[in-house]
């Protein structure tokens, strides 16, 4: 009752198709399985339903859960003190140290929607890659100020809004749109209807999104009425792809060596 696609059988030439249809730099490896999934589904139908927006609206990301835990531990410590400690630690610690992200988290401003727990690059990395001048110019590009149409009432609401206005629109929906349209497949996203968006941001309390280590609670309460329990309470797997393993295969390594060296 399902179709399996073996990653080891995927040709590296799929990258040529992705480059053509995306037509811009895109760093999400799940673009590959999304493209292949759209290609396979088109053999059976032309319109499908997608679940995009559910994680952003109802608290489904592990990063949101981690941020909530850090917030509960640090919210009563003044940002001026936390920021100073964070700045000192980030200067002396190596970026690849396990605790570096925690040192960064100390300086997160819980009142600023653009203050990120998961920056694309840390300041030290940008300075190393770009030099002082350019690093200062683009320092906040991945933490751009997000002006929400609805003012977040709680910290979780702020996290949801940040993911909704950045990751969803600039990664997830781009990936879905390019992959599906490449195969003339229409993907409809019920969670992105105006009514559900307003409902999630204005009427659903935090306790029905993330609470006591559980995520997306309200959707699971609804889902367990019609879906088997194993689907409701299974650990979130995401849509990852073994790109590191593929690059070890001869055909993939030769493909990228040729593209990069030429």
Language-model-detected regions and their locations in the chain:
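A conditional alpha-helix N-cap/helix-loop micro-motif detector
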Residues: 8, 30-31
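Short beta->alpha junction loops/turns
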Residues: 7-8, 54, 216
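A conserved beta-strand->alpha-helix junction
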Residues: 1-21, 136-142
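Active-site adenylate/phosphate-handling loop in enzymes that bind or generate adenylated species
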Residues: 11, 36-96, 167, 176-196
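Short low-complexity, flexible loop/linker segments enriched in glycine and/or proline
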Residues: 17-21, 42, 64-66, 246-248
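Short, polar/flexible loop-turn hinges at active-site or ligand-entry regions and domain interfaces
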Residues: 24-27, 72-76, 206-210
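Active-site phosphate/pyrophosphate- and oxyanion-stabilizing loops and adjacent acidic/basic residues
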Residues: 16, 35, 39, 198, ...
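Adenosyl-5′-phosphate
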Residues: 30, 47-49, 97-262
């Amino acid at each position: 009752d399902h179709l399996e696609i073996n990653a080891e059988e995927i040709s590296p030439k799929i990258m040529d198709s992705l480059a053509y249809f995306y037509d811009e730099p895109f760093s999400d490896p799940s673009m590959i399985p999304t493209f292949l999934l759209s290609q396979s589904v088109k053999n059976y139908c032309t319109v499908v339903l997608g679940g995009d927006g559910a994680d952003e609206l109802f608290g489904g990301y592990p990063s949101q859960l981690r941020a909530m835990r850090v917030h509960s531990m640090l919210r009563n410590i003044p940002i001026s003190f936390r920021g100073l400690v964070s700045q000192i630690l980030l200067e002396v610690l190596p970026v690849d140290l396990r605790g570096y992200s925690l040192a960064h988290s100390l300086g997160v401003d819980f009142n600023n929607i653009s203050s990120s727990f998961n920056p694309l690059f840390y300041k030290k990395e940008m300075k190393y890659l770009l030099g002082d001048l350019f690093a200062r110019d683009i320092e906040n590009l991945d933490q751009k100020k997000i002006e929400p149409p609805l003012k977040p009432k709680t910290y979780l609401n702020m996290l949801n809004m940040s993911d909704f206005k950045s990751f969803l629109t600039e990664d997830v929906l781009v990936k879905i749109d390019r992959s599906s349209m490449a195969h003339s497949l229409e993907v409809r996203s019920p969670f992105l209807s105006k009514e559900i968006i307003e409902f999630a941001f204005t009427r659903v309390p935090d306790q029905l999104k993330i609470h006591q280590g559980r995520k997306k609670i309200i959707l699971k309460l609804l889902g367990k009425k019609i879906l088997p329990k194993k689907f409701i309470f299974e650990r979130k797997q995401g849509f990852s792809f073994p790109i590191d393993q593929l690059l070890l295969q001869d055909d993939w390594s030769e493909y990228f060596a040729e593209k990069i060296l030429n």
